[in-house]
């Protein structure tokens, strides 16, 4: 049932009657959701039957679960499948011990039990998705017609068709996440979710978001998580458990009792490598250039390492963070930024120094050239201090001389690598064998490829890197990656030089020797590298480690791996989830049916990619060309000929029907002609008899006065307007006679001041020299008194008797005074406007 719906009658039938009544009552009283709970959370808290089945169940198939015996039977696989069918399980097995087989068996049984539901297998990359899909075809016999491979390269319309017609999907996590968010994939139909490389399920990775979205509206789905190592630390493993609702961990190591018989012996040899004289000289000279910056940090006790030869980017960044957290808050801005920029510059040049010691002179030189380009493009004053150092340019010149020598070996590791690889392939019994070399950075991989290419055809090397472009170096396309893997599996390539992309997930094939060109401090990466060999026959592992820091890094990785495995097996420090709900009804107790699975013929056929179907009509292109420009193909003979003129269609002029106005309409028209001035734009709007209602703030008194005046003005007829015009003309004639007296007399202050309660009669009597004019004007005021009283019908104030009552009676109360002031203000406004 969805979070926001109560209308489904089928969901209500399985609930207890009392629970239904209670929910309906609270729903009608609008009390559900006030505490922030969703409908599913409310059901979880109040429903006695938490295992409501959402998917259509095949009851006959639910009586048993099928275990294929097409391949050799292994106890640990059988035991893990038995647990994974009924709980959310995290399976941690070394590489090559059949995690895909376990997932395929679980998927097959859920498809049998719930034939109309969705079975989803998620893998982080498209090559992994394709590989797992082909493996499931061969193991469980799921027909190809029921499966689909979905990634971002598949159009949305095609994915929508697959969701309507198929049930088993092999997808990348971001693709199905987008489909769920946009409603293309019905999340309530998913009954089984398999997650490959589950150690990625932390933070905001798409795995975590997919499981979260499914949990919001679907409690009937099983989760099976697969990984060689679930995490570097217990905190990371706990994050995976919480994100994927894991209720059980099935972990095996190469020393486990039920695993040891299926694991071939592996020989691990260490080759400690001493630095060459050239590398030592370059290290010392470059360290002396970094020494002034290091001493600057040492004086303030911001960085403890005293020797520039021992600095690393990691320790510099740690010291910078400690400075910001503790001391950096109390420093002046200039001094603080000076220290931070020094940290940044030192961390930038510490990384090339690490490349020099562990990978060689060429990667060191290439990295410094990249830093130089960054400095000249951006504003990097502190880094330029290193580049502009007097000893920096001579050092780079000497390195360039060394690299021009074709016989020069950039690091002693390459000499050890040459001896190991050439001797191994010279043996007769190892002509069909393969070697895989792991390296952290691409520049080292490219140098190894050039170095081993000299020993062709005994050594046939190929590089295997990621798709993303780094700096100026482009990555490998997915097509080229797949071709390289196939060539390695067929034996056309017998030495594969891989970065971290070769460590995770991909089925590279049979590898008899692993060479680790550098050490990784991560237990996950260490285990994944070593797990590539020793699957069907004895494996060899060679570690090429520079003496000192790289040796210590390897020892730390081994210790961390042992401690981590012991903690996982014992369960110390881990808390499992309780959200692993039962999906099959309790009355069904399926028993195991071991049988040979028939593989459909369609699964063995080579799939030809279908041609792309054009689902949308092409949009007609718009060419922004000048008028009368030639477009398209035109012959030379047609260039001199004039274009054929198109027939012009002459339209007849539009006839305007004569209109006669009535007498009243003519008067209105004349009125508008008189009012409208040149350049005045008048828009006749709808007449409002009342002012519109406002919100919290009422209309001002000025607005109300103007509205009342305009309303009154609209009621004036033409005869009254003519009378007013004559009276005003007479008043102007009288005022011109008395103008000489006013001009010679100095104005006084009371001539400009208006009283609070002006009375036209009393005010005009004070000015004896204006009696005739003032009396006429007061008459004009009193002509409008009736209309003013109509504007405020609730005000019972007599204007004619107001002055007499004011002298005999007590003052008015506050309300009457305010109303009186409003009436007189409107009178004053109308008189002024007229």
From Swiss-Prot:
- Amino-acid positions noted as binding ATP in the UniProt annotation, renumbered to this chain: 93-100
Q: Which SMART domains match?
A: DEXDc (SM00487), HELICc (SM00490)
Coarse class of the primary localization is cytoplasm
Has keyword Hydrolase?
A: yes
GO cellular component terms attached to this protein's record: cytosol; FANCM-MHF complex; nucleolus; nucleus; site of double-strand break
Pfam families under this entry? DEAD, Helicase_C
Helicase ATP-binding domain span = 80-248
Molecular functions per Gene Ontology: 3'-5' DNA helicase activity; ATP binding; ATP hydrolysis activity; four-way junction DNA binding; four-way junction helicase activity
Helicase C-terminal domain residues: 416-582
Instruction: Tell me what reaction this enzyme catalyses.
Output: ATP + H2O = ADP + phosphate + H(+)
Q: Which residues form a coiled coil?
A: none
Q: Where in the cell is it found?
A: Cytoplasm; Nucleus, Nucleolus
Query: Where do the segments described as Interaction with MHF complex lie?
Result: 650-690
Q: State the function annotated in the UniProt record.
A: ATP-dependent DNA helicase involved in DNA damage repair by homologous recombination and in genome maintenance. Capable of unwinding D-loops. Plays a role in limiting crossover recombination during mitotic DNA double-strand break (DSB) repair. Component of a FANCM-MHF complex which promotes gene conversion at blocked replication forks, probably by reversal of the stalled fork. FANCM-MHF also promotes non-crossover recombination in meiotic cells.
- This chain belongs to which protein, by name? ATP-dependent DNA helicase fml1
Q: Which organism is it from?
A: Schizosaccharomyces pombe (strain 972 / ATCC 24843) (Fission yeast)
Gene name linked to the record: fml1
């Amino acid at each position: 049932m969805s979070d926001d719906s109560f209308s489904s009658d089928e969901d209500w039938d399985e609930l207890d009657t009392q629970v239904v009544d209670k929910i309906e009552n609270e729903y009608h009283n609008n009390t559900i959701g006030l505490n922030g709970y969703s409908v599913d959370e409310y059901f979880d808290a109040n429903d006695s039957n938490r295992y409501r089945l959402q998917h259509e169940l095949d009851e006959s198939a639910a009586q048993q679960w099928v275990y294929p015996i097409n391949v050799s039977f292994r106890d640990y696989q059988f035991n893990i499948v038995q647990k994974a069918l009924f709980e959310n399980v995290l399976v941690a097995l070394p590489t090559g011990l059949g995690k895909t087989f376990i997932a395929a068996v679980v998927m097959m049984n859920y498809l049998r039990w719930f034939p109309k539901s969705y079975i989803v297998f998620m893998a982080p990359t498209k090559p992994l998705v394709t590989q797992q899909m082909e493996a499931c075809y061969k193991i469980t016999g799921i027909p190809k017609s029921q499966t689909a491979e979905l990634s971002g390269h598949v159009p949305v319309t095609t994915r929508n068709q697959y969701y309507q017609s198929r049930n088993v999907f092999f997808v990348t996590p971001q693709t199905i996440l987008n489909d769920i968010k946009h409603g293309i994939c019905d999340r309530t139909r998913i009954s089984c979710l398999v997650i490959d490389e589950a150690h990625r399920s932390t933070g905001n990775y798409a795995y975590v978001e997919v499981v979260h979205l499914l949990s919001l509206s679907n409690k009937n789905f099983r989760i099976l998580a697969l990984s060689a190592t679930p995490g570097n630390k217990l905190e990371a493993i706990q994050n995976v458990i919480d994100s994927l609702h894991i209720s059980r961990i099935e972990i095996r190591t190469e020393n486990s009792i039920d695993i040891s018989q299926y694991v071939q012996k592996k020989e691990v040899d260490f080759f400690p490598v001493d630095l060459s004289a050239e590398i030592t000289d370059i290290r010392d000279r470059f360290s002396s250039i970094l020494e002034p910056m290091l001493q600057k940090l040492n004086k303030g006790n911001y960085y403890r390492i005293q020797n520039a030869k021992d600095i690393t980017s990691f320790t510099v960044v740690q010291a910078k963070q400690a400075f910001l957290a503790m001391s950096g808050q109390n420093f002046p801005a200039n001094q603080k930024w000076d220290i931070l920029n020094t940290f940044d510059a030192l961390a930038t040049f510490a990384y090339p120094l690490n490349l020099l010691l562990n990978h060689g002179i060429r990667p060191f030189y290439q990295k410094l050239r990249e830093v130089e380009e960054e400095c000249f493009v951006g504003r990097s004053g502190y880094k330029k201090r290193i580049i502009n150092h007097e000893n920096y340019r001579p050092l780079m010149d000497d390195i360039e001389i060394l690299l021009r020598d074709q016989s020069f070996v950039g690091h002693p590791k390459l000499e050890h690598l040459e001896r190991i690889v050439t001797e191994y392939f010279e043996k007769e019994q190892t002509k069909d064998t393969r070697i895989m070399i792991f390296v952290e950075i691409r520049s080292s991989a490219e140098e190894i490829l050039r170095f081993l290419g000299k020993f062709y055809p005994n050594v046939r090397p190929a590089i295997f890197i990621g798709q993303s472009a780094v700096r100026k170096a482009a990555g490998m396309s997915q097509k080229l990656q797949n071709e390289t893997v196939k060539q390695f599996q067929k034996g056309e390539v017998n030495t594969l030089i891989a970065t971290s992309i070769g460590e995770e997930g991909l089925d590279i094939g049979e590898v008899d020797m692993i060479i680790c060109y550098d050490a990784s401090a991560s237990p996950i990466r260490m285990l994944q590298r070593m797990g590539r060999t020793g699957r069907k026959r004895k494996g060899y592992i060679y570690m090429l480690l520079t003496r000192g820091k790289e040796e210590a890094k390897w020892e730390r990785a081994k210790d961390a791996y042992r401690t981590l495995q012991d903690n996982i097996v014992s369960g110390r420090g881990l808390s499992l989830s309780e959200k692993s709900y039962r999906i099959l009804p309790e009355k069904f107790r399926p028993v195991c049916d071991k049988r040979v699975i028939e593989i459909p013929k369609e699964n063995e056929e080579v799939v030809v990619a279908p041609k792309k179907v054009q689902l949308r009509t092409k949009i007609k292109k718009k060419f922004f060309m000048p008028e009368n420009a030639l477009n398209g193909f035109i012959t030379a003979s047609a260039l001199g000929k004039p274009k054929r003129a198109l027939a012009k269609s002459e339209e007849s002029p539009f006839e305007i029907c004569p209109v006669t106005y009535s007498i009243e309409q003519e008067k209105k028209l004349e009125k508008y002609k008189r009012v409208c001035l040149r350049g005045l734009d008048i828009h006749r709007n709808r007449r409002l008899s009342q002012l519109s209602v406002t919100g919290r703030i009422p209309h001002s008194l000025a607005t109300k006065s103007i509205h009342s005046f305009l309303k009154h003005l609209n009621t004036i007829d033409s005869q009254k307007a003519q009378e007013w015009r004559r009276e005003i003309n007479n008043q102007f004639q009288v005022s011109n006679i008395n103008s000489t007296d006013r001009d010679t007399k100095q104005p006084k202050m009371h001539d400009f001041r208006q009283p609070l309660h002006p009375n036209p009669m009393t005010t005009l009597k004070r000015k004896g020299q204006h009696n005739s004019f003032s009396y006429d004007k007061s008459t004009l005021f009193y002509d409008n008194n009736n209309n003013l009283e109509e504007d405020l019908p609730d005000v019972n104030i007599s204007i004619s008797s107001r002055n007499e009552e004011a002298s005999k009676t007590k003052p008015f109360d506050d309300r009457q005074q305010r109303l009186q002031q409003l009436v007189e203000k409107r009178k004053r406004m109308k008189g002024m406007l007229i």
